[in-house]
Amino acid sequence: MTRRQFTKVTAQSALLITTFPVKTITTQKEEKSMIRLGGPVFTRYENPDEWVNAIKLLGYRAAYCPVDITASQDEIKAYKNAAKKADIIISEVGVWNNPITSDEAERKSAIEKNIKCLQLADEIAANCCVNVSGSRNEKYWAGPHMENLSEETFDMVVEITRKIIDAVNPTHTWYTLEAMPWAFPYSADSYLKLIKAIDRKGFAVHLDPVNMVVSPEIYFNNGKMIGECFAKLGPFIKSCHAKDIIIREDIYLPHLDEVRAGTGKLNYAVFLKELGKLQDVPLMLEHLNTQEEYKSAADYIREVAKNNGIIV
């Protein structure tokens, strides 16, 4: 086509557009990512309505389980229905014991509590039941031990996790293990190894990236580690913990301290962006002493989220 022919065709097209206006095509604005933030409630509550009000006053859309394993079926049902009506997701039922302890009586009791907590999580429709895999340490129930990362311990974790899940066969929740620096799982790849070995639909991931910062290399590049976790584990993640971490600069061996969100170096921009891609996975604040500290942590997370176009 010559330039003259092009000019003629263009003029004819312009005339057609003038005579027969073309409807403007608009693209729908891309929806913003959304995260459900939650944390402990310091206000006492006696019933589901008071609990919901306490959650709403804090601006949360996720919450820890409001009852424990001693709750009646009527209580569980009432809180479950109240959460659903108020659009609050119950994030998790925490166990926090050592199911691989060498003490036979303690181990049996610990496993029984895991089963009861998983049953509660299933009945109240929490996103997950969460525990740590445990420790061979005789003094500290979740402490370091030279055998924690052995193949023997790995097999123990697999066997006991299967036993817990098979006892309940959950249909409305998942049993999850939170990462620890010196226990399975401790990285994205060790999570994948566990998922494959346990081989149960009822097993999933509870992501706490601070617990996976185990070296200066990971500390200074923790955004990369967080991205890797979501890339490899995304479909399995059911709940996350929100805290922070800082390295001591006044001593000459690596010393990492857990601190309040916003006072450390965890890459929350990456964390929130990746979490925002998932569907209704709660981000739960933890390990603080007062409601004021939780408010400061929540304010920081909301600020980072706002700066990155994420609704909290």
Language-model segments: residues:
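Hydrophobic faces of well-ordered beta-strands that scaffold small-molecule active sites
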Residues: 35-40, 63-65, 90-95, 129-131, ...
